[in-house]
Amino acid sequence: MKPIILTLFTIFFLSTSSCIENEKKETKKTTQVNLSENKEIRVQLEPKNNSGAIGKLRFNESKGIVKLEAKFMNLSPGIHAIHLHEKADCSLPDGKSAGGHWNPTFNKHGKWGDENGYHKGDIGNFEVDENGNGRVTMETKEWCINCEDQTKNIVGKAVIVHQEADDFFSQPSGAAGSRIICGGIVQ
């Protein structure tokens, strides 16, 4: 009788441990998500108001940070303002088809990062050398490329360079003068 009980016990033990083993194998399946996905948009800017100026930009998003790298040529030497505007429409000769500054949070115009508020499109000023060349580089967590948060998504907006510097005070645009380069941020 003991051998039969021992045999039955052994069979039972082996069959239940096999089920436990299968159960463990099933729970080991996981889904991996690639969090380091990079997104990139390149923008060619065209002259407006007969400026003859041109430019190119690259927006790159990695790990929740958007980096802007821009290069401009044929501008007048001095300080110029750069902003993101509401619409990726540069069809009018004066660039006004791009609308006003991109301001999805309805803040006052101001200098980027100002605790009193600023538009998400208020990038700021940059210097142009005596040869007409200028560069802008910045990084921010306040933008995203083609995300669902419309207070951060830059796709569908326009990049505008103005003839003059932004005074960071005048409402709603900073008194930066005419629009001399425009390019739509599109995918």
Q: Which ranges hold each PLM region?
A:
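N-terminal leader/targeting pre-sequences
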Residues: 20-79, 84-187
